[in-house]
Amino acid sequence: MHEKTKLLNLTSDVIFKNFFMNENTIEYTAEFINLITGIPKEEIMKKAVFENIELPIINKNSKRYKCDIIIGIAKQLINLEMNASYYEGIIEKNNSYLFRMLGDRFNKGENYIDGKKIIQINIDNYKKYKGDKLLYRFTIKEDETLELETENYESYHISLPYLKEKCYNKEKLSRLQENNNELYQKIIALLIKFYYYYGSNY
């Protein structure tokens, strides 16, 4: 490993937020969002705005919702969540962020078709879903026809254990790169950059 290389613990709340919101790494953030969602990197670089992470409170008895990172772009709101460990209720907690943001998109008098698309990207430091994959995409579909109910929101889950297992085994990593498409390879390469960030910002 390069002597100036620092191994980042991205599951740390402070490092995760600092890294993704740091002006020195904004290009990585834009590339990351682009690879996951398909939103053009240039558009993200030009129009991205870091939003208030505390969602509006409806009344005094409402539960407070405080997200990790929210990035507003022209037609999308991106919610990045680092899930350092699994516990019962974590999926429901993150879904509550997503659906709360979905409901808060509109002001009085606004057209329902003009709201921003809500996209949640979860980086999971645990294995939860079947298939032994790096990236999982979730939407709401009809059971038999697989028709999308709406395109107004979607959520992604990235498996860090999957990445670690492949990266620490050169044979598996080589096979992984051979067997997966170009998009997968780019995501893997970018996540490796996140773990091995050159510089002294941290």
Put a short name on every predicted segment.
Residues 1-202:
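Elongated, amphipathic alpha-helical interaction scaffolds
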